Amino acid sequence: MTAGHILYLIRISIENIIILSAPMLIIALIVGLLISIFQAITSIQDQTLSFIPKIIVILLVIVIFGPWILNKLMQFTYMIFSQLQNV
C-alpha cells in the first residue's frame, strides 16, 4: 500500500463524510435561519425555541435520506474491504 493509495482513501473518506452529512446540516441551517427570522420579527428572545424544530426536522431528514445514506455507506464499506486485498 503506497502513500498515494492511502491519500486516495483519506480523500474518498472525507468526501463521503461531507456528502452524507450535507442533507442534515443544510436543512438544520435553513430551519435555524427561519426560526431566527421568526424570533426577530416577533421579538421572542427564547434561545431554546429553535432546538425542538431542528431535532424534529433532522429526524425527518434521516428518515427520508436514510436509505440513500445507508446505500452510500454500504458501497463505501464494500470498496474499503475490497481494497484490503491489495495490502
From Swiss-Prot:
Cross-referenced InterPro entries: Bac_export_3, FliQ
Any one Gene Ontology BP term: protein secretion
Residue ranges crossing the lipid bilayer per the database entry: 17-37, 50-70
Membrane-related topology note: Multi-pass membrane protein
Gene Ontology CC annotation, any one: bacterial-type flagellum basal body
Superkingdom of this protein's organism: Bacteria
Keyword entries, A-Z: Bacterial flagellum, Cell membrane, Membrane, Transmembrane, Transmembrane helix
Compartments (UniProt record): Cell membrane; Bacterial flagellum basal body
NCBIfam families: fliQ
Function description: Role in flagellar biosynthesis.
Family named by the database record: Belongs to the FliQ/MopD/SpaQ family.
The protein's name: Flagellar biosynthetic protein FliQ
Natural source organism: Borreliella burgdorferi (strain ATCC 35210 / DSM 4680 / CIP 102532 / B31)
GN (gene name): fliQ
